[in-house]
Amino acid sequence: MRCHLKKWVVVAAGLSILTSLYVYMQRAQSGNLKGSVIWTWDRESWMEGIKSHYLHFNISINVLGGVLQPSKKYLTVGLSSVRREKGFYLHDTLQSIFSESSEEELDQMVVVVLLADFDLPWIQQTADKISREFAVQLSKGRLLVIHANKEHYPPLTGLKRNFNDAPDRVSFRSKQNVDYSFLLHFSSNLSQYYIMLEDDVGCSRNFLSSIQQHIRSMTDSKWVTLEFSKLGYIGKLYQSKDLPTLARFLYNFYQEMPCDFLLSHFRRLLMQDKVIRFRPSLFQHMGTYSSFRGTYNRLKDEDFVQELADNPPADVRTNIQVFQTYVPEKAYSQDVEYFWGVSPIGTESFFLVVFREAVRISRVQIHTGSDGKDELASADVELGRVLVTGEPAVDCSGFKTLGSLQHGQFNEEGVQKLLPDAVVCLRIRVTAAQPEWVIISRIQVWTVKEDKTI
């Protein structure tokens, strides 16, 4: 009982602190800093008797490149970049954002890059490089490059060593929290939504359209954070109305814990208990060396797909017994849920996707199991060319085998070369009985894109 009471007191105190944060933002032109935006954060001390030189301050954000637009966009893509001991990935990240988006998508977004290093020559050099290589995007207001002077940062040394981290790691992650705090505040009035990236990521093709689709699917739900990657704080989406509060939250608790920990606490404090993550991931970490100490880092998101699957409209069914609400449709829906089937699973078992219109297929990818468990051990993947109408459901015939699952996985590209004709269904046919249950987490289908050139 005492433990539960203690937890409740902590949560209540956290909520009290959070709800007492008040943000006032004012934009003004600085007479000393050309092209800058002054953001004034006024607040009363949220704890009686606590005084600090950084509880009340003005920060000057210098806009180094780009044109602020008079109207709001749909999405702001925000990323912070610092000088690395090894590697430089910012150019590739920006190139990926712009090249993987259509002109229509680019008109709906703005990319904000905070050059957050204290090395001013590096800042100038990097800003000049961006100006040369992305001149068109800067001129169209699709890209903004900003910087905050060191004088606006709170103390970054002599901080609390929570988690027993080394002092330099504490300083690094604490500064990173402040970097994102400044970036969030600057971006809070630029668009309807905001997504957080790092400066060493690659993007899926047409990622904005996919984000819009998922946001529409959440119309009837209240949410704080939507996630489009499983790595750290890459791909976390927020509503811009929450950005000032989130920015203040990161700033107030900048030395307590890493940014991804704080973001999780923020989500829970605003009463979203469960993580809402969509799959496949839209963003992939591509850096080889970390911005901290230049250490080797090959972290990858295995759920990332460069070109998102089409998954044309279809009806899905199986003769495998369904466990609770883990219905067959969830394997084909491209969200975080999955199909879960109960044993026994025998050679008569199948999983069938019947397309509502005949389609030409270029690629099929299937993932089964979770953490090495509940994999479909032995099955063939087949495409059917003839629709058979009957009772109790529509079926198919004229099957051609694409291949077999290997360790519960299947990935076949260039399907149109093996089967150039349109097909009406995809079947996973079990070829050996297994006592284990089965999870089919993802079925992805890419269709042949017709060449519209003459």
Curated annotation (Swiss-Prot):
Its cofactor is a divalent metal cation. InterPro entries: Glyco_transf_54 (IPR006759), MGAT4_A/B/C_C (IPR056576). It is found in: Golgi apparatus membrane. The chain crosses the membrane at residues 7-24. One of its GO terms (cellular component) is Golgi membrane. Residues 25-454 are lumenal. Pathway: Protein modification; protein glycosylation. GO terms for biological process: protein N-linked glycosylation. It comes from the Eukaryota. Residues 1-6 are cytoplasmic. Its EC number is 2.4.1.145. GO terms for molecular function: acetylglucosaminyltransferase activity; alpha-1,3-mannosylglycoprotein 4-beta-N-acetylglucosaminyltransferase activity; metal ion binding. It is a single-pass type II membrane protein. Disulfide bonds: none annotated. Keywords: Glycoprotein, Glycosyltransferase, Golgi apparatus, Membrane, Metal-binding, Signal-anchor, Transferase, Transmembrane, Transmembrane helix. Glycans are attached at N58, N189. Belongs to the glycosyltransferase 54 family. Glycosyltransferase that participates in the transfer of N-acetylglucosamine (GlcNAc) to the core mannose residues of N-linked glycans. Catalyzes the formation of the GlcNAcbeta1-4 branch on the GlcNAcbeta1-2Manalpha1-3 arm of the core structure of N-linked glycans. This is Alpha-1,3-mannosyl-glycoprotein 4-beta-N-acetylglucosaminyltransferase C. It comes from Danio rerio.
